[in-house]
Amino acid sequence: MDCTEPWEKTPNYKSAPVMEGPTVMKWDGVYYLFYSANHFMNIDYSVGYATASSPFGPWKKHPNSPIIHRSLVGENGSGHGDVFKGLDGKYYYVYHVHRSDSTVSPRKTRIVPLILKKGNDGIYNITVDKEHVIKPMWK
């Protein structure tokens, strides 16, 4: 895949277009590829997803992307993570955010519940529960 969507290549940090941090999940016979776009130092570092019927593709980017972005979760540099299933049976995405609005590193960790709603085409429309972002505290 290439950076073809406007959200995947914003000019807020000088770098070549970047796509990285892939995770693949298989739900109900469909493969879901979660990926990050933009350089991690870019305030618009974000997470989107694509789907395919095979782990080898071809991958189709979902029009609902990005699902994690500073405009959705309220913190800059929100990207590069992984999906996991919690003890409650729900799916979550763990990812990085910038230290503050003016500092990138050291980055902080966030966890957000995923909301999966199957469409008429059999593909899940994935969003996040932005009201319940988990912010681990370190002493």
How should each PLM-predicted stretch be described?
Residues 1-139:
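Carbohydrate-active catalytic/glycan-binding domains of CAZyme proteins
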